[in-house]
C-alpha cells in the first residue's frame, strides 16, 4: 500500500487574505452603464483591467428601485470608495446608456474628490441599423 502524502498547508490557510493584491493606481477609467432598469459602475485601470465595480442591485436595491437616480448615486459611491483608498487621483469617465442614473452617478463621481480628465458619452447610436422593436401598448 502506498504511503499517504503529508499535508503541508491546508486549503483554508492558503486563501486567508484577499485574492486581489492592492496596488497603487494613480489613473483609471470609470465606466457608467445606465439602463432604465439598473446602473452599473465599473472602475478599470488604463489598460482595462477591472479594479472595482458596483451596481444598484448589489447595493441592496431591488425591482424598479434599481433604476432610480439615488440607486445610481449609491452604486457610484461604493465603486469609487474602494479605488480612492488605493490611491486613484485622476480618472476618465465613460457614460453609456439612456437611464435615469447617468447624471446622479456623475454627480457622485465629481463629489468623490477624484480629478476628471474628461467625460465622454459612449452610448451606441445606430446609423439606421436594425429595425427597432414595436412600441408598447399599455
From Swiss-Prot:
> One biological-process term from Gene Ontology?
translation
- State where the protein is found: Plastid, Chloroplast
Q: Which GO terms describe its molecular function?
A: rRNA binding; structural constituent of ribosome
Domain of life, source organism: Eukaryota
Alphabetical keyword list: Chloroplast, Plastid, Ribonucleoprotein, Ribosomal protein, RNA-binding, rRNA-binding
Q: Name one GO cellular component term.
A: ribonucleoprotein complex
Matching entries from InterPro entries are given as: Ribosomal_uS11, Ribosomal_uS11_bac-type, Ribosomal_uS11_CS, Ribosomal_uS11_sf
Q: Which family does it belong to?
A: Belongs to the universal ribosomal protein uS11 family.
PANTHER family according to UniProt = 40S RIBOSOMAL PROTEIN S14/30S RIBOSOMAL PROTEIN S11
How is this protein named in the record?
Small ribosomal subunit protein uS11c
Q: Which organism is it from?
A: Lotus japonicus
Tell me the organism's taxonomic lineage.
Eukaryota, Viridiplantae, Streptophyta, Embryophyta, Tracheophyta
Please name the gene that encodes this protein.
rps11
